[in-house]
Amino acid sequence: MDKRPVPDLLTPMLKPIETINTLITAFRTASAPLDIKAKDSVVQIQPENAEARVILILDGALNIYRTADNLRFVRAAAPNLFGMQGSPFRNNLYQFRSEKGAVLETLPYSRAVELVSEHQLFKEVLDFQTYLSDFQAYRTNLLISKSTYQIVCAFLFELEMMPPEQRLRTSVFNYIHEHTHLARSGVMKILSDLRQGEYINIENGKLVAILKKLPREY
């Protein structure tokens, strides 16, 4: 039985919505709608034999997956934008897939850089890039040198922080599995034990609430 304690998780800075909206407003002076043909359509930041581009998420969300192992990294909801790193290597590490109903616009990376200079938005870009870097470090920290129990608890906390309408549409197991690829048997055993101990309330596979502080050890 695993005896590692649940870690005191450090959460990243809050999403800088005002900063993101400022950048989107500037970029929309040169952006064009991006046609989304179907749910889970792949959105390329670095199209083959074409200039890199910046993607603006105006409504809905993109799901971001690691290319190497198809692990879902995060659901990025509007308002949001991606591609300002300008790095082909980083762009190719992830695959961006649109959700049904997502409203996206795009502009060339070079034009986005020009607009940043024209509108003196260097601080906004730096603040947003800091947020992205912090979130990436937070996600990585969840999975490195952690036990299955610690990881399950961390993603239960993430689910708890979701808006209720989104949380009650989200399968607890699917959410954990998509982000971790942990074995079903291990995850379900932990969830069952936490339910029996009346630590969590799960109905129809969805998290209703965390009822009390989760045990430090399992």
Question: Where do the language-model regions lie?
Answer:
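Polybasic "coupling" helices that flank or enter modular domains
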Residues: 123-182
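Cyclic-nucleotide recognition modules
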Residues: 72-129
